[in-house]
Amino acid sequence: MSHLTDLPPWAALLVCGLMLVGAATTLIGSLGLLRLPDFYARLHAPTIATSGGTILLCLASILCFAVLQSRWVFHEVLIIFFVTVTTPVTLMLLGQATLYRDRFEEQQGVPRKQKPAPGEE
């Protein structure tokens, strides 16, 4: 027997909406990771879309279990905290490491470390 039958209709609609939007946002972030042309563009998809989708899914879980059990769910709050803190920091470090490598290899299209002097452009 599922406890979800005890969920009030207003909460069920809100949980369903949050889950659908969160799943769609996560899917868009994952597709962006696959479809974007280069590494630097691919960094934005998991940072923004996948993190946002995960947060929406956790909010749906918080709402569902808070209504069913009449208590706050702490695990999802920790997940939201760690996703919002670790994902951007990790991808920023990956981006900086890739930029350093590309500058070291002198690849075309990589921005310079410093602005060029006035006659050097």
UniProtKB/Swiss-Prot annotation:
Q: Known Pfam families for this protein?
A: PhaG_MnhG_YufB
Q: Which domain of life is it from?
A: Bacteria
Tell me, what is an example of a GO biological process annotation in this record? potassium ion transport
Q: GO cellular component terms?
A: plasma membrane
Where does it localize?
Answer: Cell membrane
InterPro entries given in the database record: PhaG_MnhG_YufB
User: Carries keyword Transport?
Assistant: yes
**What terms describe the molecular function in GO for this protein?**
sodium:proton antiporter activity
Q: Does the keyword Transmembrane apply?
A: yes
Keywords attached to this entry: Antiport, Cell membrane, Hydrogen ion transport, Ion transport, Membrane, Potassium, Potassium transport, Transmembrane, Transmembrane helix, Transport
Membrane topology term reads: Multi-pass membrane protein
Q: Where are the transmembrane segments?
A: 10-32, 45-67, 72-94
Q: Which family does it belong to?
A: Belongs to the CPA3 antiporters (TC 2.A.63) subunit G family.
Q: Fill in the subunit field for this protein.
A: May form a hetero-oligomeric complex that consists of six subunits: PhaAB, PhaC, PhaD, PhaE, PhaF and PhaG.
What is this protein's function? Part of a K(+) efflux system which is required for the adaptation of R.meliloti to alkaline pH as well as for the infection process during symbiotic nodule development.
| UniProt-recorded name of the protein | Probable K(+)/H(+) antiporter subunit G
